[in-house]
Amino acid sequence: MNILLSIAITTGILSGIWGWVAVSLGLLSWAGFLGCTAYFACPQGGLKGLAISAATLLSGVVWAMVIIYGSALAPHLEILGYVITGIVAFLMCIQAKQLLLSFVPGTFIGACATFAGQGDWKLVLPSLALGLIFGYAMKNSGLWLAARSAKTAHREQEIKNKA
């Protein structure tokens, strides 16, 4: 079984489970899928990728709240919101000089989820975090399944060759 098929199988199964978990816990299922997406899209895999994805998602949530609260300081002055957004977007990118914050799309995913969740970071954050863990489980269980399948196929071939 190839890697893509293995990951597709585990992602399909765990996506269904995530949908149930999200509803059961009162979380945002769509935000959880954004957490999954962050892990899959991160160029680093394994625990390092999980840590980088978590740090960038969290930073995105924080940056979104800076924009939301900063813009609310002077709601009658619309230009302030635009200036704050521009400055924060710059900072969201430049922070990537730090290893744990090096996945810029993760930062923007966290911010966008917070905006879509209308600034309810207390709901967005656990939804993203649990979704991120599901993404880690989806990909790594798929890689495990592919490796196990390859090992089994190799053993079967050795048995055929000996016969």
UniProtKB/Swiss-Prot annotation:
To E.coli YahC. Keywords: Cell inner membrane, Cell membrane, Membrane, Transmembrane, Transmembrane helix. Its main location: membrane. It is a multi-pass membrane protein. Pfam families: DUF1097. It comes from the Bacteria. Residues 24, 70-71, 120-122 are periplasmic. One of its GO terms (cellular component) is plasma membrane. The chain crosses the membrane at residues 3-23, 25-45, 49-69, 72-92, 99-119, 123-143. It is found in: Cell inner membrane. Residues 1-2, 46-48, 93-98, 144-163 are cytoplasmic. This is Inner membrane protein YcdZ.
